[in-house]
Amino acid sequence: MAFSDLLEQVGSTGRFQVLHVTLLSMPILMMASHNLLQNFVAAVPPHHCQPHANLSMSSTDAVDVLRATVPLGLNGKLERCKRYTTPQWQILSLNTSESLWDESMAETETQSCEDGWFYNMTEMSSTIITEWDLVCDYRALKQMSQTTYMGGVLVGAIVFGGLSDRFGRRVLLLISNLMMAIGGTCVAFSTSFTMFCVFRVCCGMALSGLVLNSFSLIVEWIPTRVRTVVGTGTGYCYTTGQLILAAVAYCIRDWRWLTLAVSLPFYVSFLYSWWFLESARWLVLTKNPEQAVKNLKTVARINGRSAEGDKIDLEMLQESMKKEMACSKGSYSALDLLRTSTMRTITICLSAVWFSTSFAYYGLSMDLQKFGVSIYLIQIIFGAVDIPAKIIVTICMSMLGRRPSQCGALVLAGIMILINLLVPSDLQMLRTSLAVIGKGCLAASFNCCYLYAGELYPTVIRQSGMGWVSMMARFGAMVAPMVLLLGDDYPWIPGFIYGGAPIVSGIFAFFLPETLSQPLPDTIQDIDDRGLARTNSKRLPEKLDLAMKDPSCVLLKESV
């Protein structure tokens, strides 16, 4: 009897699994809120220098004061980061068209905003930008805050991944929920930008812990036949979370209250997480079979199969877990990802795919203001496009194969982003449409690469492989915000990089072997025997893909 048969005995799709998956999915709704929170708490409102402090606004019209103190740029708008050293009252004698640009005024001495900035707060009441004046010389700090957050996600994946295998999924899930709740609360009450960044790093680490342990607990308590459906459902929870963020941000315009609103739900999830049962698989592999038997009997009781649960004993459990226990004794490491030429090709190509997908995805998603429309509306559109994108790529993966779907999604995303560079800025509808298509393609690429990577890596090192490519994705998300700084002098550079990276990685993906209808490899030797050159020409009979075969030695952990 395999463990899957044991799970069927106590009920694999009963009341317990419904409650278990539902409660574990609830925090996923709020994960997108923290990943994309920067779009709203760090939105940059229109701003310009405050007039000289010694000027009396009561005796002079405010518009005239601005004309005399803040120069106009070539676009006819007030300069954001400089003002005249002394008020130029003679400008008021010129008509509007003459004062837009005058050679003599171009040579007038200017200075930085010595008395601070004036912010047009029509869309929000406060952001970290207005709170700490993160504009002009300090504008890079906005991108740095998102980079540090993604750095926390990266560190959390490394830390919580190891701790989870040592101390269990349930304990780490409790810690992650509490860490996210407290970290988010501290972010909301930050008194300095440094404090803000420190606690955002904590939130990033907690998010990784939530992702890793939530998905582990989900897949380890459900049968193989429903993993595809459940995995798709939890993925749509993240998509729904993007829509929730837009709605909450629209209602709460203050960055502190908004941060608090998306953090408080984690206190609730922390409280009900005490109810979760530890994975029976993990308990057996860590030499605690007695507790595993108790948990299985609890599942049987909740599912109304108490009689079947009473039949389970230590001997039956250990017999069902023989294969898992044998696999756990293997001496494999991350170095095995590069052991052979075939493994090196797979690892290098997947690294490029994951890095570029995450890099371009967050590059587009974290710069909503450039589209010139309401950031709340564009957030809803960007979130909604994931729904059809994931459906389409799922169909394509089943009919055309993994490799063409992965290549096509990446190349099409890159083309959409590059074409957008050629569209005039006044054609906002077209620019937004192209960006939405590009973002949808990147979401489809994410959907594809999770399945593709899991099918390419053999069972004995699948967890190490997924951990490595996930780390590359986090690294891409860290770098993405900083690329936006290159657009200060050359606005086309970020778009060129964001568009070029997916196309290049799409070429890398072409060198990956096809896995549609192929059996899951169990060892590195299986990968070498299959061979890159023979992948498309030779298919084995009775083939099973990742969605249908139970990876009993090492369970695939996904991250959103």
Swiss-Prot record:
Q: Which family does it belong to?
A: Belongs to the major facilitator (TC 2.A.1) superfamily. Organic cation transporter (TC 2.A.1.19) family.
Signal peptide start and end residues: none
Cytoplasmic compartment residues: 1-15, 165-170, 223-228, 278-345, 396-406, 455-465, 513-560
Q: Which UniProt keywords apply?
A: Cell membrane, Membrane, Transmembrane, Transmembrane helix
Membrane-crossing ranges are: 16-36, 144-164, 171-191, 202-222, 229-249, 257-277, 346-366, 375-395, 407-427, 434-454, 466-486, 492-512
Q: Which domain of life is it from?
A: Eukaryota
Q: What is this protein called?
A: Solute carrier family 22 member 6
Localisation: Cell membrane; Basolateral cell membrane; Basal cell membrane
Free-text comment on this protein's domains from its UniProt entry: Multiple cysteine residues are necessary for proper targeting to the plasma membrane.
